[in-house]
From Swiss-Prot:
Topology versus the membrane: Single-pass membrane protein
Keyword Transmembrane: yes
Regions crossing the membrane: 15-31
Protein name per UniProt: Protein CEBPZOS
Keyword Metal-binding part of the UniProt annotation: no
Designated gene of the protein: Cebpzos
UniProt lineage: Eukaryota, Metazoa, Chordata, Craniata, Vertebrata
Keywords tagged on the record: Membrane, Mitochondrion, Transmembrane, Transmembrane helix
InterPro entries named in the record: CEBPZOS
Length: 80
């Protein structure tokens, strides 16, 4: 019975691994896009504010401060 389950377990493992790799690649692309575009961050603040909050916290934890404040300042001046 163990020999029969081995190919199935291998297929499941490969599927889970592929899903993880797609997820990591997607998260990296999203981070890169948010990091390079203030306009995209503004779009994210309107549609997905919780994702933008994770972005701000991650860059603040890495030692980059002031991005949130610069964004808020620009968005406030663009409204006026």
């Amino acid at each position: 019975m163990a020999r029969i389950m081995e190919p199935l377990a291998r297929k499941i493992f490969k599927g889970v691994l592929a899903a993880e790799l797609v997820g990591v690649a997607g998260a990296y692309c999203l981070f890169k896009k948010m990091h390079s575009s203030q306009d995209f961050r503004q779009t994210m603040s309107k549609k997905f504010p919780f994702i933008l909050e994770v972005y701000y916290k991650s860059i603040e934890q890495s030692g980059m401060y002031g991005v949130r404040e610069k964004d808020e300042e620009k968005w406030l001046t663009s409204k006026n």
